[in-house]
């Protein structure tokens, strides 16, 4: 996809609260009024605990009408609880002559949401002394009901409610908070008790079981950690079980705070309750206040020390809960994010009891819970960040980038150390010069030839404090474990240019050894002053405002055993005799003379520090008659019998983003979704994937896929390569063909930004080997029929050092040479694949060489859209020439206002100004077939929709092969064909696209298989049926 960097940067300057931008496949810009949005790339809570217990959330009804809330729920949770909407007060509308009347519409919406998205729902609650209307206990004259009458009414209520949702609610809190340990018999003196005595408890469970025999039935209460209350609950439930009452579990609410109860007190209750045979435990209402009970404190912002205390306690709780996963089957948080918490309204003051801040950003508590899960992830991105989107990325006419002017600093006299055993990569996550929080994210790289004990390593970040205050630092997340990172604030004896302090980052022994060529992975750091007053970063030595992605920053220095081995200290910097030390202080360092070790050779291995090689699974794709391979004849793609076919497909990304599976499988069923794509007429699936992921697979390394196993139980226990095998097999079964697309080099959600097919560590040879390996794995299966070699090679020759070019040279940046080399190596393994080759960004005008630095000397268009070089320098694959397909990308004015989108543009003007000179001539002059690999956008009722209609119609008229961008809901500038549940289709957009899908004269969609029809609905056909019915050939136009 394309990006408009000027639009992004200008808005980053305007929007002060955006601390960083997370990218997946492409970058999006955000208007001024946009609030901080969730980071969709961070690990899913429920996925992280899929082997332990369900992770649920209580939500109010308003969440069901908020797309962001719904998407947050579906990403992180596989169970929901209606916060109030399924309580008696919400359901009961009144009495009638025949019984009770109800308001079910909101509760129905909750149950439908859970059912539609294939997640669980807990029913809360049937019997409670609170939030039950007073009239329920009275007759029509306002007099209290008799015991028998009240029990009869309760029975009707339970039958009506539980019966309505039979088979849809997996667990009910049947009786809630019936215990008061201060009473002589410990039963709460509620109206229930006053009329019925404790008998109502037994009856409620019996009737709930009769109404739905398969639902799990729970007794639910708070303060279950108090010994007296705990013991009575234990005895009551044990007695109920002994009498044969159908009770299946105890709900421990766990409304706790940072100081009480202790984790051991919670554990003691779990131990006791789980000793009752046949009883399971649900943590039903978990939240953790920053205040002690009865505290008069009222914070306007959350104190950092309390947030850290909260995160540590959450980690300890979840670590403990995992020990009891055989009895603890569900953990539900009572709220989605802090400003939704009941604690704010109940006590009338700010509180931050949950895992996400008000702006959906992940708190330290979230990362603590993730860390406790034991899940490792290559590059989580904590908030605040904008929504992760994949958006098309244009190449605009050069526009000056808006950046702050850096303040000059004097040249230091200290000697830089840059050739040692380690170096530091830095990413600035706070771009505002005035800020109350400094956010340097770091990676330590072992650039030497031997391993290094990280406990010997320290890093210094140099800055000015701008007003003496106590300071605190924290690692929100670190791949080596945040608990293994230490901090120390060191004041200099006298101020120097750019610094009067440095923050020293160290490592505990648990961080382990750093191997040659590897890095520590991301270390996310932030620090602040105790009163949250501002720093001015503008003059800080270590701050590089524009380095928002990882790069080498020599002003962040590194030391081994106190000896400078990387970077450049500010001139004259020496520590003061006294130091301000963070809570995780390490001993005072002794400064040693600067030493420049002997340079070690640079390693080129891909960093994979947390992944363990395993044997490569054998492909499970069965052998089949491989007669669906396709070939090139002039400007047509034909089958084995020389009959023209029409490839009309769609993109579904995720294998390029770190999801390690298609995005959306965190909420949808993989197989069902692939079948529905085929049912709706798409006969080709373009699969964006990273070369790094393929190379990892080839080395026996399988990054974990982000899958909702509740929705996809058949994928349980499968690694990412095995899941990809299932993708291929499922596509085979539904007649859907696949085109692989090397969308990016790295799987870091930003690799696509790099313009070519290699980077400083990933060599062209690595790129070729990745393509060869995956070709060889599936060479005997004609489900994968095409290989799009590299997504959008690009770069501006007039300003970029590295850019993709197109000529007959063997230059490392010559995309034509790289494409020919890669294609031949692929075809030597599988000569049957179609080779799809995209264009570049800029091509020189006549008599201009690639050395020109004038933008006016080049023709520029969308990334991947410039195929002008084919006329003079066509791809030459020798004996494989009948496999070459060219593939431009094209987008509309909502992505970027290209010069051809002038007022009143027409289809003919687009053809003359853009399409024909850049790529359409290849089809018109019968040079080769075209496959438009990406096109799509929003139906805005304006110019973008007009462009989409013109291109769609041009595609249809000429039977141009295409793959629409895209299926995904999370594609920012284009939108997708489905909503964020990845199951609800945008019918308006689909109807718009439908005419561009291959259909016969009866409107049946045509697949590219010769035996299997397309899809599973019995309505579509295959190539053989199409031609047996004497249907017309879908032939492209030519002059």
UniProtKB/Swiss-Prot annotation:
* Catalytic center residues: 177 (proton donor), 285 (nucleophile), 792
Q: In Gene Ontology terms, what is a biological process of this protein?
A: cellulose catabolic process
Under Gene Ontology molecular function, one entry of this record is: cellulose 1,4-beta-cellobiosidase activity
Source domain of life is: Bacteria
Q: Which SUPFAM superfamilies match?
A: (Trans)glycosidases, Carbohydrate-binding domain
Q: Which residues form the signal peptide?
A: 1-28
Protein EC: 3.2.1.4, 3.2.1.91
Keywords on this record?
Carbohydrate metabolism, Cellulose degradation, Glycosidase, Hydrolase, Multifunctional enzyme, Polysaccharide degradation, Repeat, Signal
The record's catalysed reaction(s) read: Endohydrolysis of (1->4)-beta-D-glucosidic linkages in cellulose, lichenin and cereal beta-D-glucans; Hydrolysis of (1->4)-beta-D-glucosidic linkages in cellulose and cellotetraose, releasing cellobiose from the non-reducing ends of the chains
Instruction: Please verify whether the record's keywords include Cell wall biogenesis/degradation.
Output: no
Q: Where is the CBM3 domain?
A: 418-571
The family classification in the record reads: In the N-terminal section; belongs to the glycosyl hydrolase 10 (cellulase F) family.
What is the name attached to this protein's record?
Answer: Endoglucanase/exoglucanase B
- Organism, scientific name: Caldicellulosiruptor saccharolyticus
Supply the source organism's classification: Bacteria, Bacillati, Bacillota, Bacillota incertae sedis, Caldicellulosiruptorales
């Amino acid at each position: 996809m394309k990006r408009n960097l000027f639009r992004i940067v200008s808005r980053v300057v305007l929007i002060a609260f955006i601390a960083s931008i997370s990218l997946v496949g492409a970058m999006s810009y955000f208007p001024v009024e946009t609030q901080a949005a969730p980071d969709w790339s961070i690990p899913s809570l429920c996925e992280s605990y899929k082997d332990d217990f369900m992770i649920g959330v209580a939500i109010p009804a308003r969440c069901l009408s908020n797309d962001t809330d719904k998407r947050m729920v579906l990403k992180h949770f596989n169970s929901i609880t209606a916060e109030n909407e399924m309580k008696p007060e919400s359901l009961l509308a009144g009495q009638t002559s025949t019984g009770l009347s109800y308001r079910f519409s909101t509760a129905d919406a909750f149950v439908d949401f859970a059912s539609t998205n294939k997640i669980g729902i807990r029913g809360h609650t049937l019997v409670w002394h609170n939030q039950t209307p007073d009239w329920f206990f009275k007759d029509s004259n306002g007099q209290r009901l008799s015991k028998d009458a009240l029990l009869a009414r309760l029975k009707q209520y339970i039958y009506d409610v539980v019966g309505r949702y039979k088979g849809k609610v997996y667990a009910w809190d049947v009786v809630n908070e019936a215990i008061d340990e201060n009473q002589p018999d410990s039963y709460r003196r509620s109206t229930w008790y006053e009329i019925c005595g404790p008998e109502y408890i037994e009856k409620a469970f019996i009737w709930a079981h009769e109404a739905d025999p398969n639902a799990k039935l729970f007794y639910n209460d708070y303060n279950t950690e108090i010994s007296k209350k705990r013991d009575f609950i234990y005895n009551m439930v044990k007695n109920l079980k002994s009498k044969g009452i159908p009770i299946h579990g105890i709900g421990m609410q766990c409304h706790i705070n940072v100081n009480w109860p202790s984790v051991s007190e919670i554990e003691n209750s779990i131990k006791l309750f789980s000793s009752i045979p046949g009883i399971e435990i649900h943590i039903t209402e978990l939240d953790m206040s920053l205040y002690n009970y009865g505290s008069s404190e009222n914070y306007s912002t959350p104190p950092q020390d309390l947030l850290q205390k909260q995160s540590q306690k959450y980690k300890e709780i979840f670590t403990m809960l995992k020990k009891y996963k055989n009895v603890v089957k569900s953990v539900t948080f009572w709220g989605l994010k802090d400003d939704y918490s009941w604690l704010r309204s109940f006590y009338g003051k700010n509180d931050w009891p949950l895992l996400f801040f008000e702006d959906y950003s992940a708190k330290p508590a979230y990362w603590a819970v993730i860390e406790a899960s034991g899940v490792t992830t290559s590059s989580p991105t904590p908030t605040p960040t904008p929504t992760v989107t994949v958006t098309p990325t244009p190449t605009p006419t050069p526009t000056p980038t808006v950046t702050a002017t850096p303040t000059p600093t004097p040249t230091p006299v200290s000697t830089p150390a840059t050739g040692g055993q380690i170096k530091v990569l830095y990413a600035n996550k706070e771009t505002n010069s005035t800020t109350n929080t400094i956010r340097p994210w770091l990676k330590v790289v072992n650039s030497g030839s031997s391993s290094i004990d990280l406990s010997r390593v320290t890093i210094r970040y140099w800055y000015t404090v701008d007003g003496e205050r106590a300071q605190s630092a924290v690692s929100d997340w670190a791949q080596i474990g945040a608990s293994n990172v230490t901090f120390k604030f060191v004041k200099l004896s006298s101020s120097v240019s750019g610094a009067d302090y440095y923050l020293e980052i160290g490592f505990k022994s648990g961080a382990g050894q750093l191997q040659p060529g590897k890095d520590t992975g991301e270390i996310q750091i932030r620090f602040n002053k105790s009163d949250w007053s501002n720093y001015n970063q503008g003059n800080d030595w270590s701050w590089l405002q524009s380095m928002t992605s990882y790069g080498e920053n020599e002003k962040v220095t590194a030391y081994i055993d106190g000896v400078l081995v990387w970077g450049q200290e500010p001139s004259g910097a020496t520590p003061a005799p006294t130091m301000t030390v963070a809570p995780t202080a390490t001993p005072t360092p002794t400064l040693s003379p600067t030493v420049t070790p002997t340079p070690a050779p640079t390693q080129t291995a891909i960093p994979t520090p947390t992944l363990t090689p395993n044997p490569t699974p054998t492909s499970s794709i069965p052998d089949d008659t491989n007669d669906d391979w396709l070939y090139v004849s002039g400007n047509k793609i034909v089958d084995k019998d020389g009959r023209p076919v029409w490839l009309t497909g769609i993109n579904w990304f995720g294998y390029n983003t770190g999801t390690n599976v298609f995005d959306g499988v965190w909420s949808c069923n993989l197989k069902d979704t692939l079948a529905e794509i085929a049912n709706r007429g798409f006969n080709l699936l373009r699969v964006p994937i990273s070369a790094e992921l393929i190379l990892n697979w080839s080395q026996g390394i399988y990054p974990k896929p982000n899958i909702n196993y509740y929705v996809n139980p058949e994928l349980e226990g499968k690694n990412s390569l095995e899941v990809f095998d299932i993708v291929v097999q499922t596509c085979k079964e539904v007649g859907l063909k696949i085109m692989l697309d090397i969308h990016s080099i790295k799987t870091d959600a930003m690799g696509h930004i790099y313009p070519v097919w290699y980077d400083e560590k990933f060599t062209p040879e690595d790129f070729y080997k990745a393509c060869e390996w995956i070709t060889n794995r599936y060479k005997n299966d004609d489900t994968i029929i095409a290989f799009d070699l590299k997504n959008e090679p690009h770069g501006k020759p007039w300003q970029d050092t590295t850019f993709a070019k197109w000529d007959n040279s063997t230059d490392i940046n010559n995309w034509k040479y790289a494409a020919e080399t890669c294609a031949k190596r692929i075809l030597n393994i599988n000569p049957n694949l179609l080779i799809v080759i995209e264009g570049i960004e800029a091509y020189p005008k006549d008599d201009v060489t690639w050395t020109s630095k004038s933008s006016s000397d080049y023709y520029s268009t969308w990334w991947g859209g410039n195929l002008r070089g084919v006329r003079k320098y066509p791809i030459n694959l020798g004996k494989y020439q009948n496999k070459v397909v060219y593939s431009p990308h094209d987008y509309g004015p909502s992505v970027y206002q290209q010069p051809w989108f002038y007022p009143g543009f027409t289809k003919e003007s687009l053809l003359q100004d853009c399409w024909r000179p850049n790529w359409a001539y290849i089809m018109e002059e019968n040079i080769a077939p075209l496959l438009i690999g990406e096109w799509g956008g929003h139906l805005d009722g304006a110019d973008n929709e007009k462009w989409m209609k013109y291109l769609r119609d041009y595609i249809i008229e000429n039977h141009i092969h295409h793959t629409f961008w895209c299926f995904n809901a999370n594609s920012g500038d284009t939108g997708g064909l489905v909503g964020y549940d990845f199951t609800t289709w945008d019918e308006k957009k689909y109807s718009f696209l439908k005419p561009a899908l291959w259909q016969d004269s009866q409107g049946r969609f045509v697949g590219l298989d010769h035996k299997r029809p397309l899809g599973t609905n019995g309505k579509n056909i295959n190539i053989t049926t199409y031609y047996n019915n004497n249907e017309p050939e879908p032939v492209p136009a030519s002059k």
